[in-house]
Amino acid sequence: MAQNRITRLMQQQKKLLIAYYMPEFPVAGATLPVLEALQEHGADIIELGIPYSDPIGDGPVIQNAAHTAIRNGVTLRKVLELVRKARNGEGCKKITVPIVLMGYSNPLFAYGGDCFLADAIDSGVDGVLIPDFPPEEAIDYLDRAKNVGLSVIFLIAPVTSPERIEFIDSLSTDFSYCLAVNATTGTAKLSGHAGDAAVEEYLHRVRQHTKKKFVVGFGIRDKERVESMWKLADGAVVGTALLEQLAASTTPQECAERAGTFWQSLR
């Protein structure tokens, strides 16, 4: 079995800039050009959202993007098809950076757990993050994912106890994903700056109780915040701000241009 792209990336000593994108948002046909633009302008990992009709844990921007994606025909099967095309260079330059699928458990288990794992790895997916799947219930699923070569990522929040941080760190295959605040995605009230004492204390606590790398998401919008998070974590995830930049686009090409320009501004 070839080594997972995420595993290879985590062996490098670099700070990561990770993109979250909802497929086919805001227009059908945008996904492959956007992936190419993100890769070209320095995205280290690309997270693709799996749209769900009731995304209760997401902020309004991602909720709207999910509903738009559904209207544009996006299903889990469609997402896997797009990943396969991206890996093969069909409709864009070949995408070689790691791809993570992020979505709620209902669509994945409706697809069929083992079928999803097999089809995900076959299409070129490297990892999965299921926010509403408690780690305690994921042990068997985690073993099956590892057997096919998929990296599984779990969430840590500011209220997570030190003991639970260690438990989550032990389960996450390559890295954990830290929520920057106890809030829905993209609606953080905290600044996210390294100078924010609450954020610093939280991420120092995570560092003390983890052996693997961790990245931070939720509410990161610009280069200054990215660099602040790089001082405290191993990577920064930018999603809501990217979707906001794309929202007014009317063609796939315009989406790609906006994605590239915005992503370049974060580096």
Curated annotation (Swiss-Prot):
EC top class named in words: lyase
Reactions that this protein is recorded to catalyse: (1S,2R)-1-C-(indol-3-yl)glycerol 3-phosphate + L-serine = D-glyceraldehyde 3-phosphate + L-tryptophan + H2O
Pathway: Amino-acid biosynthesis; L-tryptophan biosynthesis; L-tryptophan from chorismate: step 5/5
GO cellular component, one term: cytosol
Pfam families named among the record's database cross-references: Trp_syntA
Keyword terms of this UniProt record: Amino-acid biosynthesis, Aromatic amino acid biosynthesis, Lyase, Tryptophan biosynthesis
Species this chain originates from: Chlorobium chlorochromatii (strain CaD3)
GO MF term set: tryptophan synthase activity
Protein name: Tryptophan synthase alpha chain
Subunit details: Tetramer of two alpha and two beta chains.
Entry annotation: catalytic residues: 47 (proton acceptor), 58 (proton acceptor)
Functional description taken from the UniProt entry: The alpha subunit is responsible for the aldol cleavage of indoleglycerol phosphate to indole and glyceraldehyde 3-phosphate.
Coiled coil: none
